[in-house]
A protein has these predicted regions:
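Hydrophobic residue at the +6 position relative to the catalytic HRD Asp in the kinase catalytic loop
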Residues: 266-270
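Long, charged, glycine-rich C-terminal linkers/tails
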Residues: 99-110, 195-216, 402-410
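ATP-dependent phospho-/nucleotidyl transfer catalytic cores
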Residues: 72-79, 91, 139-147, 152-259, ...
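N-terminal accessory/targeting segments that precede structured cores
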Residues: 1-117, 143-165, 371, 401-402, ...
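Hydrophobic HxD+1 residue recognition
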Residues: 261-265
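Conserved beta3-strand ATP-binding lysine motif
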Residues: 132-134
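Conserved ATP phosphate-binding architecture of protein kinases
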Residues: 116-124
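Helix-rich C-lobe and terminal helical cap/extension of kinase-like folds
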Residues: 17-22, 26-28, 32-33, 59, ...
Length: 438
């Protein structure tokens, strides 16, 4: 759910208390009423380009102004479905009108969801749920348009003109195809929910299996403050939220061997004490042990062993750096140090928005002598979105922590003792779930 503020916050005492207010906000004349409206709005490559715009949104600061303007237009949100069209999807997928499937059903969407929208409902047994409904026909439309490699290539070459974007295109196409499949998304969400079950601060809503299909996902309704609201909280609370997001990200990588590839402010809900609920698992990258090992080795090379030459060899063997590139090892380390500056040395460090923007600008510096010799292997394309997106989130929070100490708790080769109260609580969780939680 990566557009709008994702008005998932459920602080009203009754499920439908804000329906009247939302009716005033909903522009009914702009609602998509039929499957043909969906095809007209998101067909002829517009849906694919929107998805690429969303996936590439984290590189805005690294692009030239003309490319930035194009990317901004691609990120425009899609009009909501009319209540009748959304209901027709529920009928097709769940076998009956939403008012019959659910005890209560809010016909107006409470959130945008990239290629669909989210409705509040109450199940027959009284559970409050969020029902994510996909635009009818959008999966087929975008899947067909993914064959237009030439147009996709021309767009990506704006961002990385010095690189061969073939592998980048293939990875983006594969990830977009997966995001169209709500069965896969629901399975991703189940995996994350099972892994983080009982975690002291990170929560993933459970999927309601019997009410989920290829076009509908029904989950527990999550409550909490939106990101924009949480920014007004005391800095101590923002630091705790940032620590949870950081731990969630890297526990996922090293424990589940998976990344939720959409670190977007709209995908989090917050409660005091560092409690964060994580939403939307359509874009998840799973790593094999062979794909994960170079990432672990680069951490060891640069942060633990302080061995620049070994770091260079690992980059070359993993495909990030051309073999025998005519650039110094020092230049390579300086170029990629942006991803390690926060964890190379112990001690508190504040990540600011300016710093996060500088990471993007430095990494996508097309004038760098390394630009023509660097590459992003297909397996790691989404990794860069996650890294840069995470920096952007932490920067907005002006988050301060000893990121190195927290990382040492998580790195499989170190597994240091807890360095914070949250780390102590997490260690207890891991001890209780040792067979599952890495």
């Amino acid at each position: 759910m990566c557009s709008s503020d994702l008005r998932y916050a459920a602080n009203a005492p009754r499920l439908f208390a804000a329906a009247g207010e939302r009716r005033q906000q909903l522009r009914d004349d702009l609602a998509l009423r039929t499957a043909q409206d969906v095809a007209d709005t998101l067909g002829t490559m517009k849906g694919v380009l929107m998805k690429i715009g969303q996936l590439a949104s984290y590189v805005d600061d690294g692009l030239a102004p003309p490319a930035r303007r194009v990317l901004s237009r691609l990120q425009d949100s899609v009009p909501p479905m009319s209540s009748e069209l959304a209901a027709s999807v529920v009928v097709a997928e769940l076998g009956a009108a939403p008012e019959r499937v659910f005890r209560e059903w809010d016909p107006l969407p409470i959130a945008a969801a990239s290629i669909g929208q989210v409705h509040r409902a109450i199940t027959a047994d009284g559970q409050a749920v969020a029902v994510k409904v996909q635009y009818p026909g959008i999966a087929e439309t975008i899947a067909a348009d993914l064959g237009n490699v030439a147009l996709i290539k021309s767009l990506l070459k704006m961002a990385v003109p010095s690189q061969d974007v073939t592998a980048l295109i293939e990875e983006l196409r594969e990830r977009i195809r997966e995001e169209l499949d709500y069965v896969r998304e629901a399975e991703n969400q189940r995996q994350f929910a099972a892994y983080f079950d009982g975690h002291p601060t990170a929560r993933v809503p459970k999927v309601i299996d019997e009410l989920s299909t290829a076009r509908v996902i029904t989950s527990e309704l999550a409550a909490g403050a939106r990101f924009s609201e949480m920014l007004g909280w005391p800095q101590e609370e923002r630091d705790l939220a940032a620590e949870t997001i950081y731990r969630f990200t890297f526990r996922s990588l090293y424990g589940l061997h998976a990344f939720n590839g959409d670190p977007h402010p709209g995908n989090y809900l917050f409660e005091p004490g560092g409690q964060v609920t994580f939403l939307d698992f359509g874009l998840v990258k799973h790593f094999t042990p062979a794909e994960l090992e170079p990432l672990l080795q680069m951490n060891r090379d640069i942060c633990i062993d302080h061995d620049p030459e070994a770091f260079r060899r690992t980059l070359e063997s993993a495909g990030f750096l051309h073999q025998d590139a005519p650039v110094s090892t020092q230049a390579i380390v300086e170029h990629l140090a942006v991803f390690y500056d926060t964890i190379r040395e112990p001690g508190p460090l504040t990540i600011t928005s300016d710093y996060a923007s500088s990471v993007v600008r430095r990494f996508f510096n097309l004038r760098s002598p390394l630009a023509e010799y660097m590459a992003i292997p297909q397996s790691y394309v989404i990794l860069q979105r996650i890294n840069l997106g995470l920096f952007a989130i932490l920067g907005e929070l002006s988050a301060t922590a000893d990121w190195r100490a927290i990382s040492e708790e998580i790195w499989p080769s170190v597994r240091a003792p807890a360095s914070t109260p949250m780390g102590q609580a997490e260690a207890g969780w891991r001890a209780r779930r040792r067979p599952i939680a890495a």
